[in-house]
Swiss-Prot record:
It comes from Desulfatibacillum aliphaticivorans. This is Pyridoxine 5'-phosphate synthase. InterPro entries: Aldolase_TIM, PyrdxlP_synth_PdxJ, Pyridoxine-5'_phos_synth. Its EC number is 2.6.99.2. Belongs to the PNP synthase family. It is found in: Cytoplasm.
Length: 235
């Protein structure tokens, strides 16, 4: 039975499209929690394309479950995290030209800087997750760097729905749990593809945003969150 953390970035995307102050992702965070979600996720990107600094600060003050801050491992973002103190920081790679995060963090390549970021955040009382591709070398590197959690990038599977991509996720999840890390999963998961994860018991929590916000346009945020939460609980 997996948990569900809901990403409200795309509520902010809609707001920023018109440069107005609505819809407010802060209000969305409240509704997400009232619907029963296990946490709220926001990605404060360096270019501030959707979530803004004030969103992070206000959501941190009002959230009753947990706030997960997705962020690049830059001095600026680490400083903000230490000030805001989210319940969890998820380190992700970032490219300004990408529409959304395109791949996992290369912990093997950047092991020293990632380990330093993890140490700094943990010293501030923040649990640290690394968003990584389902690759065994990345899992081993994440563990060696000191991560508390790995969030497995599920984008390849959600695009292809291939048995090979699912097998990679299962293998990575098993290894991560074996070495003592929590296992989360996210990216590209919708109301159909989440059902393919039934039986992957190593996954403890899903991080999902776009598909929930998209469904909410038609049936409302409360109903969309509850529908996805029911599916996550079956995993």
């Amino acid at each position: 039975m997996a948990g569900l953390a809901v990403n409200v970035d795309h509520v902010a995307t809609l707001r920023q499209a018109r440069g107005v102050d609505y819809p407010d992702p802060v209000a969305a965070a409240v509704l997400v929690e009232l619907a029963g979600a296990d946490g709220v996720v926001v990605h404060l990107r360096e270019d501030r394309r959707h979530i803004q600094d004030r969103d992070v600060r206000i959501i941190r003050q009002i959230v009753q479950s947990k706030l997960i801050l997705e962020m690049a491992a830059t001095p600026e973002m680490i400083g903000i995290a230490l000030e805001v103190r989210p319940h969890q920081a998820t380190l992700v790679p970032e490219k300004r030209e990408e529409v959304t995060t395109e791949g996992g963090l290369d912990v093997v390549m950047h092991k020293d800087s990632v380990a330093d970021a993890i140490k700094t955040l943990q010293a501030g009382g923040i649990k640290v997750s690394l968003f990584v591709d389902p690759d065994l070398n990345q899992i081993k590197a994440a563990h060696k760097a000191g991560a508390d959690v790995v969030e497995l990038h599920t984008g390849d599977f959600c695009e292809s729905r291939s048995p090979k991509a699912m097998a990679a996720i299962q293998e990575a999840a098993r290894l991560a749990r074996k070495v003592g890390m929590e296992v989360h999963a996210g990216h590209g998961i919708d109301f159909r593809s989440i059902q393919d994860f039934v039986g992957v018991k190593e996954i403890q929590e899903f991080s999902i945003g776009h598909s929930i916000v998209s469904r909410a346009v038609f049936i409302g945020l409360d109903a969309a969150v509850k529908e996805m939460m029911a599916l996550a609980r079956q995993v």
